């Protein structure tokens, strides 16, 4: 098994099965240094020379899923280096929950350091895309890491305190609302939310957008009539038109800010 050893991480190109060569994209299993040591992730690199913008693609509360890998692969086919870190499998979380957990935030910092030092990436053209739990993380990462240029939040919670959900407690209830972190954000932010979201109401997206614009930050908000949570992935809640539009807007947004 071939290895490339860098100062921050080890990149392991798959030998069984072989690296995927689909639509001009190379795929690899990788490890990077996270909060508690080596963390697994998948890396997608478009073919062609030159340094490219890099995008972290963050999974939801269910952890890494094939649909997230597919999204990252498709984004790489558009010309971006993409990385999908597994933020859950190697940690044991207490019953108070995972929201804004220091271990996860440390893993995110490690993932950013990893993509910045890859020879295929431009170290100052870094973006983050996240879904639900990962959508909140994308914006939080932008607040904690000013080098991030673009953050895309798909239907993530802006403020657990504003949800009014009796089941919300523990770390989530004590978390700092994203609306109180906007002053630290330098990145442009794209918020995409279904208007029929039964898991995290669209008001959460609007709340964040208002806070960003009032703080003089760059924010775009798109809401999709009839679209529920996770509208852009296959399943009972899939909304074809919202999925198509949100994808096109994500790609255009990242091209604007990372190229």
Across the structure, where does each feature detected by a protein language model lie?
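Conserved alpha/beta-hydrolase
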Residues: 76-92
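C-terminal catalytic histidine-bearing segment of alpha/beta-hydrolase fold enzymes
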Residues: 216-259
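Primarily recognizes the serine-hydrolase "nucleophile elbow" in alpha/beta-hydrolase
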Residues: 110-184
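The serine-hydrolase catalytic nucleophile loop
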Residues: 63-72, 87, 203
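Short beta-strand/loop motif that positions the catalytic acidic residue
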Residues: 185, 191-193, 197
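Short beta-strand element of the alpha/beta-hydrolase
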Residues: 51-60
